[in-house]
Amino acid sequence: MKVFRIFIITFSYYLISCNADISKEKNNNQKSFQKVKIYSVPSSFTFAGESIPLDLPDVRERFDKELHVNSYLHSSTILLLKRARRWLPQISEILKSNDIPEDFKYLPVIESGLENAISYKRAVGFWQFLAPTARENGLVVNNEIDERYDPIKSTYAAVKYLKKANKKFDNWVSSAASYNRGVRGIENSMKSQKVNDFFSLYLNKETTRYIYRILAVKAIFEDPSKYGFNLDSLDYYYPEKLKEYKITRSIPNLTNWSLTNGSNYKELKRYNPWLRKNSLTLRKNKNYIIYLPNR
């Protein structure tokens, strides 16, 4: 009987302890849940100087969705912010000097994450050009050279595309949408639906989301701390010091060439990803710039 009483007392203490732990864990979970921040859609917002009609319920809700998706996509958004410090100043300068609104710098952010990505459709580079479109806009794409992998040259190609698109639509939001759907795709949708602006169009999910992702990235990048991203200056990636080599004649072996110039093939490929083979054959009166670390 005494043994049974001891068992009951011990078991009771165990249950009390378990309940206390469960209650403590529940309170901790509730506190953690309460720390999740809800972000408000701005009262007004623009893209490329054009007002976004946030009074429309679907526009507001789609923007709200992308704000939260991208705010809580922590690792990806942090890396985008880090890379942006290296690339967006250069991209912005090219856009502005060619009369393209600076907000278009956010297109390569969502297109490729500011990396030389390759899509399942074989779109390549920061600006995700397909080979035919790249050639149409002045890029060299062949067996040895693929300038879609050159962030600077491909930005100039994007400028050409966007100028043609805006000449067609006279609207920068629609021009941005055409970068995803194609000029003809947006134009056909406008004709069939008898409207002439993006926010009145019923479009495929990908293109619709594309614009709102751009808006969300712009909001976050313009005020990262507001959305929970607090990076110190040392956290960012910055442009590296590089030395230019003007190439005026063919190079039969790029590995040997890089070693001769105090570098190696790995560094050559890092700073010149547009070189697709171990050789560079120049046509008459053609030259290129190759970059290597400036030691």
For every predicted segment, state its role.
Residues 100-115, 175-181, 218, 268-271:
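Short, functionally critical alpha-helical segments immediately adjacent to catalytic or ligand/cofactor-binding
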Residues 232-262, 286:
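Primarily a LysM-type cell-wall glycan-binding module
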Residues 205-228:
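Catalytic cores of secreted or luminal carbohydrate-active enzymes
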Residues 162-189:
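Catalytic and binding regions of secreted/periplasmic enzymes and modules that target cell-wall glycans
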Residues 4, 13-99:
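An acidic, Gly/Ser/Thr/Pro-rich helix-cap/linker signature
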Residues 122-143, 155-158, 162, 186-189:
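Substrate-binding/active-site groove segments that recognize
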